[in-house]
Amino acid sequence: MADVLSVLRQYNTQKKEIVVKGDEVIFGEFSWPKNVKTNYVIWGTGKEGQPREYYTLDSILFLLNNVHLSHPVYVRRAATENIPVVRRPDRKDLLAYLNGETSTSSSIDRSAPLEIGLQRSTQVKRAADEILAEAKKPRIEDEECVRLDKERLAARLEGHKEGIVQTEQIRSLSEAMSVEKIAAIKAKIMAKKRSTIKTDLDDDITALKQRSFVDAEVDVTRDIVSRERVWRTRTTILQSTGKNFAKNIFAILQSVKAREEGRAPEQRPAPNTAPTDPTLRNKQPIPAAYNRYDQERFKGKEETEGFKIDTMGTYHGMTLKSVTEGASARKTQTPAAQPVPRPVSQARPPPNQKKGSRTPIIIIPAATTSLITMLNAKDLLQDLKFVPSDEKKKQGCQRENETLIQRRKDQMQPGGTTVSVTVPYRVVDQPLKLMPQDWDRVVAVFVQGPAWQFKGWPWLLPDGSPVDIFAKIKAFHLKYDEVRLDPNVQKWDVTVLELSYHKRHLDRPVFLRFWETLDRYMVKHKSHLRF
């Protein structure tokens, strides 16, 4: 049986009449409730783990009846009549499918459970006015109709009885035919009579009982239909309802995997206390009688005790190395040494606990218009020279999600000598991917200008101002010296770094000033990090 959305499309394209009576929508000999769900997915549902929701028949039928209205007027009228509206992104695609312009739609979920419509019997179902009219008739007419039906059925049964084979006819035929032939003919005639009488009886009894049992049959049918499920095969499951095949199939695989894991629990040893019969529980334990062969169980063990021979041992499943080493290798395995308690001054965390990272993090803008990007961040901050991002693209450089730069600096030793050391810094342009514990290691951020750069950041004020962010993270702004300063950067606590368009020999002092400013900030606020 077709789904309600396909039936509605067929009636709409063929301009057939759709009857709405009470809480039911009637399509010829089938009917569905108004609030029955179709298999057309509502836009915006079924994403990011949310369950899918479907339009009801009433909402789609209301859209067809008011398709001439503009969408705002249609929404107001639907809200007045308390009917769910069809959302604007679904309106054009849904109307194109219902009007026959397209054969299918990507929003139709073929795997959704179908609501089976109730079949309306034209002979049994009667209109409400006819039922009221018959209720006003005298009771005698109904009794008279039933009596006439019974007399007609009895007359038909009597007619069949007259046609039954008579015994004297069998006696007359016995002279001309054998007993086997007569029995075969009699069996054929009786079989034919039984089938004929059975068919007539079914028709008459059905005609008599349809009036009184029709409501009970409808209730039973509705209960059966409500328990039905859509028959799924390998072919129907592998048919994706959308453009993304993995979204449908991988979800099914995950459900199958979860179900299989749930069916195979850990195998635990059976408890010793097994349920026993109460009659056996009450019986007293019978003392074991003497057995002359019990002594044989300990005889072999006593004879080989001095040779240390395991008479029940085996080499099955053992490797050559384990056989040659013998028991000596097993004796060398000593039990694990007990941990020696240490004084509090020498206490240290267990080796399996992961220590927090001390590598500082620098955040740069993700916009391609920024002077510093993931393509040239290593050239600017590590090599202290400016290389435009476009030039790096021409060289075939690939953009990475994050990069690790090695800053070379001179560190003063206690003896007064300086040693060149290398300190790592982590550079990222996707701050929303940072873990909550990583934000404590963020030491610098390059500001582009617009405030939307800090959307989703911690410490952001309700009005979207990043003032509190700059109080916890050192902010820098990189621009050309001939470009006008952004108004937002002017009013924020940001250190401006200016580069020349053509004088590349001036790049090194600019980036050295960046590192000096950052070092002073980290000494004061981030001294627990490595720098």
UniProtKB/Swiss-Prot annotation:
Residue spans of biased composition, Polar residues class? 273-282
Q: Which regions are flagged for Basic and acidic residues bias? A: 293-303
Q: Where in the cell is it found?
A: Nucleus
Q: Give one GO molecular function term.
A: RNA polymerase II complex binding
Motif Nuclear localization signal covers 125-139
At the top level, the lineage of the source is: Eukaryota
Question: Where does the record place Pro residues bias?
Answer: 338-352
What does the UniProt keyword field contain? Answer: Cell cycle, Nucleus, Transcription, Tumor suppressor
Q: Which Gene3D superfamilies would you find in this protein's record?
A: RNA polymerase II accessory factor, Cdc73 C-terminal domain
Q: Name one Pfam family in it.
A: CDC73_N
User: Does the keyword section mention Cell cycle?
Assistant: yes
- Supply the InterPro entries for this chain: Cdc73/Parafibromin, CDC73_C, CDC73_C_sf, Cdc73_N
Q: What does this protein do?
A: Tumor suppressor probably involved in transcriptional and post-transcriptional control pathways. May be involved in cell cycle progression through the regulation of cyclin D1/PRAD1 expression. Component of the PAF1 complex (PAF1C) which has multiple functions during transcription by RNA polymerase II. PAF1C associates with RNA polymerase II, is involved in transcriptional elongation and in histone modifications including methylation on histone H3 'Lys-4' (H3K4me3).
Biological process annotations from GO: endodermal cell fate commitment; mRNA 3'-end processing; negative regulation of cell population proliferation; negative regulation of G1/S transition of mitotic cell cycle; negative regulation of myeloid cell differentiation; negative regulation of transcription by RNA polymerase II; positive regulation of cell cycle G1/S phase transition; positive regulation of mRNA 3'-end processing
Give the primary localization class.
nucleus
Q: Which GO terms describe its cellular component?
A: Cdc73/Paf1 complex; nucleus
Family from the record: Belongs to the CDC73 family.
Q: What are the boundaries of the region Disordered?
A: 260-303, 325-358
Protein name per Swiss-Prot or TrEMBL: Parafibromin
Assembly, in brief, is: Component of the PAF1 complex, which at least consists of CDC73, PAF1, LEO1, CTR9 and RTF1.
Its source organism is Gallus gallus (Chicken)
